[in-house]
């Protein structure tokens, strides 16, 4: 147990800013601070420095608080915290060092805030009633049995950045593009459907959206450069670059809710990609609020880096464990989010995840909220040894309704993602991987990869990481990768067949099927296996390509429809082909074999 964890008290009361009927309360947790000052601003523009300052009073258990008699909805704010210099080992570059009294003063936004202005530099007091789009109070998640679940992953920008997608120019790359219900390719009347209309026709039940909390790699004022967003700044605030006005903290909330409501109206549930394992930088808001507490340290005193991003968050520490659980419940309750995908879940402790499961279950309809993540990390971390992390070794301690991505299925079907030209079952090595693929189809029962129930296993062959499925197939099914047909314009019938079989295996396997958006129309990134900060053009969904390759989309549509009609695919019940003649038991079977022409189900 670390010194700060052993010596600092845990605070159980509300944190952040709370707008009450007759006033506003500001509360932060900063046990080592000797003074905390609240600064109030009229605007979110960091160039406008005119402010009113108020000293917070020390409360119980390491908290500081100020109660105002005014309802300060729409007011922006930040904090100035003063610490003994000895309490701050990682001094921010903008800190004020007071040599005379041996203190350091640090500015920070509120890490517990629910709204903020441009680039998250100032937090905002929010009146949630004013952020509800029309019809929000009647919004309900679609009732979808877990056995019918089919997950489609996308990015807010990728979904609508293509100028041929038919989205209004002001909605491209924004939350509001999901509210455009009748878009077509190039706005042609009766043309190929794009956006929400396309999703409804495809038949997927859940859309997993890559990070849409406030992240740091994109300038919200300009919307550039492009980034996936795996660099959190404010966990409980929507990303401003996806809104039509990043300076007004209420707009991003309203438009994010509108996106979710539109998906619900289309019969689709929403899964939020969350990144509680690290933050944008070592010098983050939580570290500024309580230096040395929220981030893990290695044995030499530096930041632990199992995430590969410079800092690992200490989920096992009580106040960050509480932060994670509170954050998940908040997004589910306030935004009607239907599920959570945990980035590098192998860096989070199983106790926190299990507690989150219990708290989400308490919400109305909460038991239907999905939880799953990546059971691995980028490198070793330095968690407290009494806690078990949710990696492949520790995942057996997870609640039976917390799942994980099955890389065993992925690599067996298409080949190891770490070896770009290594084929799998569908693209060159059917004999080598046949037994593993049989295990995949059966949900890995009887193997080390099995879960407490088959619903814990996310079956997939493509996600935002690594090569797209099409690019992997192109690289492994041609002798010269320099001439890979990424555009799918030549003689690629054998590659299309491999793509189709891969989809068939995933969509008839036990567990929950998952796909990267565009997999169903041979999405390409031209061999780029990590496009997180490449151009919007490389990453966006090419709706013209979708129209051109609609025959493959029809194959996916058929598979999805068959799976949804037959829950036996989900729970993995299998038949013996030599079953007794005349048996009355309901039976379902699929047969797959690798061929060089598009397959049919048998």
Question: Positions of the model-derived regions?
Answer:
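A solvent-exposed, charged loop/short amphipathic helix patch at secondary-structure junctions
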Residues: 164-187, 472-492, 535-537
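Conserved alpha/beta catalytic core and glycan-binding cleft of carbohydrate-active enzymes
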Residues: 357-517, 521-522, 530-532, 567-570, ...
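Structural beta-strand segments of beta-rich domains
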Residues: 22-26
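Glycan-recognition and catalytic regions of carbohydrate-active enzymes
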Residues: 8-11, 511-528, 546-602
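Hydrophobic faces of well-ordered beta-strands that scaffold small-molecule active sites
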Residues: 150-152, 207-209, 270-272, 340, ...
């Amino acid at each position: 147990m670390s010194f700060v964890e052993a010596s600092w008290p845990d605070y159980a009361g509300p944190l952040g800013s709370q707008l009450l009927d007759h006033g506003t309360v500001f509360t932060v947790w900063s046990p080592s601070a000797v003074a905390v000052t609240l600064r109030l601003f009229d605007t979110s523009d960091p160039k406008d420095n005119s402010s009113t300052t108020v000293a917070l009073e020390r409360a119980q258990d390491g908290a500081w608080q100020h109660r105002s008699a005014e309802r300060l909805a729409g007011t922006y704010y930040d904090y100035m915290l003063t610490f003994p210099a000895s309490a701050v080992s990682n001094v921010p570059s903008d800190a004020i060092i007071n040599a005379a009294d041996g203190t350091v003063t640090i500015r920070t936004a509120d890490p517990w805030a629910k709204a903020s202005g441009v680039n998250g530099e100032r937090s905002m007091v929010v009146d949630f009633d004013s952020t509800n789009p029309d019809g929000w109070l009647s919004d309900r998640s679609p009732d979808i049995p877990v056995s019918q679940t089919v997950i489609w992953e996308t990015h807010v920008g990728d979904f609508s950045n293509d100028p041929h997608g038919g989205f209004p120019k002001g909605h491209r790359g924004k939350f509001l593009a999901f509210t455009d219900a009748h878009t077509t390719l190039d706005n042609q009347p009766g043309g190929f459907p794009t956006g929400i209309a396309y999703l409804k026709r495809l038949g997927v039940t859940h859309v997993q959206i890559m990070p849409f909390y406030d992240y740091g790699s994109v300038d919200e004022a300009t919307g550039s450069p492009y980034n996936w967003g795996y660099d959190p700044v404010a966990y409980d605030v929507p990303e401003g670059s996806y809104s039509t006005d990043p300076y007004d903290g209420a707009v991003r909330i309203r438009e994010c809710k509108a996106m979710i409501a539109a998906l619900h109206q289309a019969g689709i549930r929403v899964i939020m990609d969350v990144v509680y394992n690290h933050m944008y930088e070592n010098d983050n808001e939580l570290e500024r609020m309580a230096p040395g507490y929220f981030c893990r340290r290695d044995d030499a005193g530096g930041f632990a880096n199992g995430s590969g991003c410079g800092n690992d968050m200490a989920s096992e520490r009580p106040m960050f464990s509480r932060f994670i659980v509170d954050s998940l419940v908040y997004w589910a309750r306030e935004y009607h989010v239907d599920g959570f995908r945990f980035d590098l879940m192998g860096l989070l402790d199983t106790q926190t995840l299990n507690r989150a499961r219990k708290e989400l279950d308490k919400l109305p309809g909460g038991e239907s909220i999905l939880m799953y993540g990546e059971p691995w990390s980028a490198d070793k971390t330095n968690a407290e040894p009494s806690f078990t992390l949710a990696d492949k070794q520790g995942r057996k301690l997870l609640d039976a309704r917390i799942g994980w991505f099955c890389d065993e299925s992925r690599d067996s079907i298409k080949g190891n993602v770490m070896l770009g030209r290594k084929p799998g079952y569908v693209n060159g090595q059917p004999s080598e991987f046949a037994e593993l693929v049989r295990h995949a189809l059966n949900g890995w029962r009887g193997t080390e990869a099995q879960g407490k129930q088959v619903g814990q296993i996310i079956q997939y062959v493509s996600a935002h990481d690594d090569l797209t499925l099409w690019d992997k197939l192109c690289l492994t099914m041609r002798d010269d990768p320099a001439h890979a047909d990424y555009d799918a314009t030549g003689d690629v019938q054998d590659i299309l067949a491999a793509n189709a079989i891969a989809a068939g295996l995933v969509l008839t396997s036990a567990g929950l099927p998952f796909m990267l958006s565009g997999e169903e129309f041979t999405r390409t990134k031209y061999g780029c296996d990590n496009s997180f900060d490449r151009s919007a053009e490389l990453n966006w969904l090419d709706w013209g390509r979708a129209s051109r390759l609609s025959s493959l989309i029809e194959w996916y549509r058929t598979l999805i429809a068959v799976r949804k009609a037959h829950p036996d695919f989900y729970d993995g019940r299998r038949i013996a082909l030599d079953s007794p003649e005349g048996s009355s038991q309901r039976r379902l079977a699929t047969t797959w074999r690798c061929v060089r022409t598009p397959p049919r189900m048998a």
